[in-house]
């Protein structure tokens, strides 16, 4: 704890600081709660997207087995040509949003290639799109967790350090100022008594001199 001046001006500084901490703490606490809620929501969405991806793969596993046996699925038939991302903002945090993906198809003869290859390619695009969406959601969570950590640290700083420290400073300064006031009153009374005593002695001397 830094050493403080036990003065009236310092008392005002400490009271203003305490007022500021108490004013901003509810806002920080609300932001912390909002971030926690948003993170849970996004994590649930990412889980749902991955579940959809798993269901898609499970429903298509027979096709995958056929591809493996026949070795007829062209290698590199699907490529991601572009990932479309937008921008969002949650609790003051800029985050990427997934808006879709563009895919390229490798060269293959539509007339000579079995129809199931084209159907499989469509399923692969859907699966890859879900993977990309989940990755963007993971990035959202990562960015929000960074902000949540910083916000939580500020909340803890205000609650456990700054507010108690400032309250203690105010108490310390107030006690010191009260002690000074008492001392000033005592000194004033002593001074008045001394003056009265001197006046009395002077009066007695005047009487004796007559």
Annotated model-derived regions:
Residues 1-210:
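Charge-rich amphipathic alpha-helical interaction elements
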């Amino acid at each position: 704890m830094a050493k403080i001046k036990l003065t009236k001006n310092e008392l005002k500084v400490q009271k203003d600081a305490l007022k500021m901490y108490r004013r901003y703490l509810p806002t920080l606490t609300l932001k912390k709660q909002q971030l926690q809620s948003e993170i849970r929501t996004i994590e649930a969405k990412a889980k749902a997207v991955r579940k959809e991806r798993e269901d898609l793969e499970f429903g298509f596993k027979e096709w995958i087995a056929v591809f493996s046996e026949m070795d007829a699925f062209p290698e590199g038939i699907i490529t991601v040509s572009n990932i479309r991302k937008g921008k969002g903002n949650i609790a003051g945090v800029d985050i990427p949003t997934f808006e879709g993906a563009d895919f390229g198809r490798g060269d293959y003869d539509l007339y000579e290639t079995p129809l199931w290859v084209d159907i499989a390619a469509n399923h692969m695009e859907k699966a890859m799109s879900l993977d990309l969406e989940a990755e963007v959601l993971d990035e959202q969570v990562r960015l929000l967790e960074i902000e949540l950590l910083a916000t939580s640290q500020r909340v803890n700083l205000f609650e456990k350090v700054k507010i108690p420290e400032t309250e203690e400073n105010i108490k310390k300064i107030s006690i010191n100022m009260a002690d000074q006031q008492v001392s000033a009153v005592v000194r004033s009374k002593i001074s008045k008594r001394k003056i009265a005593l001197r006046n009395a002695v002077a009066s007695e001397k005047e009487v004796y001199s007559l």
